[in-house]
Amino acid sequence: MDLVFVTNNDLKFKACQKILDVNLEQVKLPLVEIQGEPREIAILKAKDAFKKVNKPLIINDSSFCIPSLNNFPGPYTSYVEKTLGSNLLKLMEGNKNRDCYYLDILVYIDAYSLKVIETKTYGTLSLTEASGDYYPLDKIFIKDGDNKPICYNQGNMYENNGYVELNNYLKKRKVSRGIVFFADKVLLLYRKRLENNKYLEYYAIPGGGIEKDETKEEACLRELFEETSIKTNIITYLESEEYDTGICYYYLVNYISGDIKLGGEELEKNNPDNYYEVRLVPVSELDNIYIYGKGSEIIKEVYRKYKA
């Protein structure tokens, strides 16, 4: 996977590059600067970056927070670092509570989804400023467990668990599913399987895994044809859903041709203990059945918006 990290901080890029199992490219460009809450600021920066780069990317927006100063500078960290810098120590003169932390908000964005990961790195403010050509705040922040400012620990000063969480997110199985309406009915895959001596019954929106070098749209149409034997085309992308083991992308699709019948691997492995059946289910009956994931909620919302 190719991924862009929009950052002017070379050390942040190197720290991220060591953790992510992707082809990571650094891009330096100015981003929109607004006042607001840290999370809101980070999301708007990511959206601004995506408009300019138009590739899957991440940004990492950091806020330096001092609880005894009401979490100042917080969202004004960049401005304070440029103007006040390590002179921030003067504001702490006589203050016995020198606790502080970095709030890192990592945002991943692509054409289909947006993922926000927040992490905090706790520490204390040093009594004196470290020497050397470093970022001003890095010369006065001592991470918990260390005895000197993080500027002296260049190897891992910008590493945080957010990159690990992002790496796990990017590795999740990607799935595309297509919602097809026939008048007031929706096409679903009925499942009945034996598990721990009990039969589990549920429905799923037709779809499956995205193969290598296949787009999400191509996977949606291919899976629909393999599972239900019908040809369709994409009307619009709807939304994504993240769960423990994967990420699902939902599309509204239009029926073109073909007789509805079970096909593909589902037909080959169909048996009484692992049963598949393609069904047209009235939208009015969705509350009476269980559809895997957010299926029922998404179908009803789409039906109200596009079909009702």
Name each model-derived stretch.
Residues 3-4, 11-173:
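Anionic-ligand binding patches
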Residues 83-84, 109-114, 122-124, 181-186, ...:
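Short, charged/polar surface micro-motifs in flexible loops or helix N-caps
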Residues 107-108, 142, 180, 252-254, ...:
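Short, well-ordered beta-strand micro-motif
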Residues 185-226:
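Conserved Nudix-box catalytic region and its N-terminal flanking loop in Nudix hydrolases
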Residues 171-188:
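Conserved N-terminal beta-strand and adjoining loop/helix that marks the start
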Residues 159, 164-170, 200, 261-308:
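Nudix hydrolase/Nudix homology domain
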Residues 56-59, 231-239:
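A short coil-to-beta-strand element that immediately follows conserved catalytic motifs
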Residues 132, 210-233, 241-292:
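Unchanged
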